[in-house]
């Protein structure tokens, strides 16, 4: 069953988020005060509304309690983001996710009711930095502060060796959790022999993964 989303704010993040959610088969309503932005995205989402997100009656008319997730994507105007987040919770929104640019803003948003805060620019910068600073890195996902999963090509000297031979966990404090083959994630055990073109998924602290690949 498709999830329902309310996306408030049609900047770059809000627009791209709404479109990707639609691509994934969800139902998406968007709200912004800029008529041009709303008209541009309207053909591509379930519903598109023009209105002031800080107007309680406007938000009430959208029935925030009926959405599975409400995204507040207006971090450029922090006062507006705060008020909108607070109003959504007052109107019964079950899950409010707010965009923030600073840690202080995130703390305040959580304090007034946001269920989760995201930092899209910072997260993208971190992913990009990791991809280009780690040899062979293909993808990077931070699961929690200080813990990540990375997809990468195996280092050249791993070829023809097993996880057991290389003693990866003990030496680097990194776990090899799977391998990617023909687009699918497959299990891997300690006796698997790496080939030069093996793609693996590893989990651990980002600095440990970096040391393992670049120095190991």
What are these regions (language model features)?
Residues 21:
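Aromatic pocket-lining residues of Rossmann-like dinucleotide-binding sites
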Residues 11, 34, 102, 206:
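Residues in the short beta-alpha loop(s) of Rossmann-like NAD(P)-binding domains
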Residues 103-166, 191:
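Anionic-ligand binding region
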Residues 27-29, 96:
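Short beta-strand element of Class I
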Residues 40-128, 153, 208:
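Phosphate-bearing ligand-interacting subdomains
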Residues 14-15:
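N-terminal Rossmann-fold NAD(P) dinucleotide-binding loop
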Residues 8, 31, 158-216:
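Cytosolic Rossmann-like ligand/nucleotide-binding regulatory domains
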Residues 6-7, 72:
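Hydrophobic Val/Ile/Leu positions in short beta-strands of Rossmann-like dinucleotide-binding domains
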